[in-house]
């Protein structure tokens, strides 16, 4: 799932939509049931074709590449994003936090970095953007545990599950070991709070009109974390 930011100032709304459309379509391919791996791979190939200067009738990709060039996105960010989406097509568990962090960098942190470029925010806020993207994505994982089980995916590190005596995140395991399950979820929420605090350190670098939008989104996810 992708983090959404409400109340975007109108002057950059079009560009945010172009960014969001590109990300959402890639995400939809890998999250559909059954998963459309072939559709995703074609989408990825088309992106690299357009990036190399070829024309395409895929407006979403064409608009995104133009935006990327206009706002000077680092192409490595898009590589990382597509790599993480591809991980979703072939990976259903993560051994440890390092492995998960690779996924989170491409699926969430780089989106924050692209948003900073679109909002023309000082690079001092890059660290904040990465951690905010990561924190929001992580709360999505916690909120969507049930949904991800249907997709046969567990994003939480196997090492962490083991340390709470859980053999996996299954409905059966949650029913059999409710205390351990609850303690595990609490521990993951603490990790979210840590990343969220790190993100908030850079809010001061975001222009005031943008800060309201980012803070609203951040607060929505914070509220979700407290409700879980």
Predicted region positions:
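Catalytic cores of Mg2+-dependent Asp-rich isoprenoid enzymes
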Residues: 1-136, 142, 146-228
